[in-house]
Amino acid sequence: MSPAKRWGSPCLFPLQLFSLCWVLSVAQSKTVRYSTFEEDAPGTVIGTLAEDLHMKVSGDTSFRLMKQFNSSLLRVREGDGQLTVGDAGLDRERLCGPSPQCVLAFDVVSFSQEQFRLVHVEVEVRDVNDHAPRFPRAQIPVEVSESAPVGTRIPLEVPVDEDVGANGLQSVRLAEPHSPFRVELQTRADGAQCADLVLLQELDRESQASYSLELVAQDGGRPPRSATAALSVRVLDANDHSPAFPQGAVAEVELAEDAPVGSLLLDLDAADPDEGPNGDVVFTFGARTPPEARHLFRLDPRSGRLTLAGQVDYERQDTYELDVRAQDRGPGPRTATCKVIVRIRDVNDNAPEISITPLAAPGAPATSPFAAAAAAAALGGADAASSTGSGTQEAGITSLVPEGAARESLVALVSTSDRDSGANGQVRCALYGHEHFRLQPAYAGSYLVVTAASLDRERIAEYNLTLVAEDRGTPPLRTVRPYTVRVGDENDNAPIFTKPVYEVSVRENNPPGAYLATVAARDPDVGRNGQVTYRLVEAEVGRSGEAVSTYVSVDPATGAIYALRSFDYETLRQLDVRVQASDGGSPQLSSNALVQVRVLDQNDHSPILVHPAPANGSLEVAVPGRSTKDTAVARIQARDADEGANGELAFDLLQQEPREAFSIGRHTGEIMLTGDLSQEPPGRVFKALLVISDGGRPPLTTTATVSFVVTAGGGSAVPASSGSPEHSRPPGSRLAPSGPSLQWDTPLIVIIVLAGSCTLLLAAIIAIATTCNRRKKEVRKGGALREERPGAAGGGASAPGSPDETARGTGPRPNMFDVLTFPGSGKAPFGSPAADAPPPAVAAAEVPGSEGGSATGESACHFEGQQRLRGAHAEPYGASPGFGKEPAAPPVAVWKGHSFNTISGREAEKFSGKDSGKGDSDFNDSDSDISGDALKKDLINHMQSGLWACTAECKILGHSDRCWSPSCAGPNVHPPPHPPAQMSTFCKSTSLPRDPLRRDNYYQAQLPKTVGLQSVYEKVLHRDYDRTVTLLSPPRPGRLPDLQEIGVPLYESPPGSRYVSPKKGINENV
């Protein structure tokens, strides 16, 4: 349109121009800028012109657009010029497209009465990330030549993002991080974006003809939005020239030593632009490539890829040189050579190695445990040195260290090594397991295992330690090796008894060989150091001065203690035995324990009548004829050597004839008159059986016949004692209580005391005279004892059964089991009627050594009588007269060696030490020489003297008891007219050692079970080599083969009884 047409006619132009200038001068024009985000909701207020222009709004003010504008985008309110988003909303991509800025500009006119104003409004629509990038195609194919050098760029289609600025496309990348390509996004000068696929490494179509990759496009919004597309890269062949290595003549590559087999070292892509066979390239190693390298590396002849074929080791070789030759297959093949240098990079692939060398104890022999442990440790150390570290070495090493080793003592040498280099080969070592050991650095890579404290095998016998070696690589490798230290035992602990004092109780009259107790000691050491043996500590027992080893014996292996003799409570109340426990170490250690053997009292003593003194088992009490009822007639006093209930006495009067006229206090012993004797004539005799019993179980009793003679006088009915009973009883004996004391006046007490003193003096004079007379007879008769007994009726004839009559063979032979009744004992012969009834009055026979006493007409061995067998009046068994604490017996003849000696009944104990209760045949405790040579000489002398009774049967059946029994043949010129009678002895007949199959089993309950017990057993059973035989009857001449066989009684303890009694019916030959 021409200017004339645009402005009207030429004449009107100046007027219009003037009007416009006037309007512009009158109107106040201004530009207002607003901004809003796309996608804001319709009706969103963008701004108010009246407020922003500071205009006074009146009723006639209005705002209008200068020209028509799309009201669906923006709206202007007339009243105040408020701008709001239209109903269609604002879409920046639709309004402005890819423009960096999107501004909506328009003019608004404000009318009012005062003025006219033109306002230029600019509304900037800001972008919102409401669109994600998108690729033009989901599959994007790309072709690249295999000869393309590294860095080759291949254009790619750029993804589209309708947003702009930061919300637009920001990056394009490959999802595979290790692909040979990279995508680069660039912006050109005109602002357009382009994407290139960059080749990162050379391609080899023969090894990989295509790559399937994934492209990822992403914008910069918050949060960002992305899109993906598949990228297919096809490698094109190019082979129209001679092969050419892109690396040149020399190529270097670095390879980690832990690279897996098959890893690609280098792709020797020798380019040949020819096609077909001319471009078909074959790759081979050159002639100068070493054989070792050919085994470790592989070259693909078609692709030229150099890969790893074997495991490399930096510690063995760190560099390899390979000659690679490329040759095409065309006529007149062309070749190219490339030297490939492969450098091995060290990695931490070797764990540290630990070598342990234990040290033997100084001076230990080759066969000692220390040397053996050292040899085993050296072998284990060699194995460890030859192995490759595997992280944990299972083979353990054992060291042996004595428990007496001082602190800081060397135990073992530890050496560490690592075949890696640098920090990978630097090793640090630590010792774990116990604070008693520690590591002490020695020199580079070596440490010393030393003791950090004193060792005690009894507390900890073995230490399980752990050696840990770790290098300084990344990540570090470590080796863990178990290490055992055994503590060698030393004899540093003495045996310890379970308790220091053992209290043992044993009843007296125990059988020799009886088990007493067992002491136990423990030694925490091992081996010989912990082997405990027991022995007795020698000491003297009591006043006798005998060694304690003659009383008891201890088993050295088990500590069992056995009695070697029978204990007597009345002579030994307690036996203190010290037992020493010693180990087998060197030096030997020992400790002692005290064994207190308390002997318990047993009812083995019968009551003894003290006052009035009995005569031949009878008492005679004078009773005044005018005595009235309840008059004290006499007081009986008795004693019992036992204690406690065993010594409590009770009195009884039984079998009173012709009537019961007397009673006795059961505990006082006082005899009272219970009837009236005024009508009895003088000389009338009342008889009663006095029974004195103790409180033992079973009780022992003593009986005596009491004759009460009625006298005409009226004197005291209580007879005077010939001696004070208090002075006559032995120490330790008990007197029966005397009951209520009688009322004596002073003159009577003086008379009784003077009479008692005179009686004691007279008794002492008689005893001395009798002893002197007996010794003169023994010297004059050569030790042969004869007892002369005047006949009760006629005078000079010997009583039946007397020793003289027995010696001449005219009297009855004495029974071996008869009981000799000594003066005052009141005992009846064994098997005689008097054993069951009160003894009748018999004629007294004078016996040397006794005064006014009488004996029975028979003499026999002092074994148990029939009353003992019945158990009602049991008495202890005695091996000789007086053994059971009885009154002194008449002298007897003793055969010792080849002669006879005359001794008293009480003295027989000294000559028969093996039956006197002294104990075992210990050193210096034998009646004769019991050494081996002495026994041989004694046996040979017996054989030469014809003292053996062996027969032809002995060679077939073995020796019998008669072969071992002592001979009774003595020097007597009067041979007996008949075969010799069996001898009677006061001692138990025992046999010398003989065939074990014929051994007499006296104490089968104490059979030995160990070597120590066997020695005890033999001590008890075979200590009779020099046994002395005490004979009652004198010896008679005659050869031993002509004598009858000797009857040897066997003894066994009946059930429920601890008393030994002879068995009936075994008086035949054994």
UniProtKB/Swiss-Prot annotation:
The record's annotation in InterPro entries points to: Cadherin-like_dom, Cadherin-like_sf, Cadherin_CS, Cadherin_N, Protocadherin/Cadherin-CA
SUPFAM superfamilies assigned? Cadherin-like
GO CC annotation: dendrite; glutamatergic synapse; plasma membrane; postsynaptic membrane; presynaptic membrane; Schaffer collateral - CA1 synapse
Q: Which Gene3D superfamilies match?
A: Cadherins
Q: Which residues lie on this side of the membrane: Extracellular?
A: 30-747
- TM region(s), chain numbering: 748-768
GO biological process assignments = chemical synaptic transmission; homophilic cell adhesion via plasma membrane adhesion molecules; modulation of chemical synaptic transmission; morphogenesis of embryonic epithelium; regulation of synaptic membrane adhesion; somitogenesis
Q: What is this protein called?
A: Protocadherin-8
Q: Which organism is it from?
A: Mus musculus (Mouse)
From the broadest rank down, the organism's phylogenetic lineage runs: Eukaryota, Metazoa, Chordata, Craniata, Vertebrata
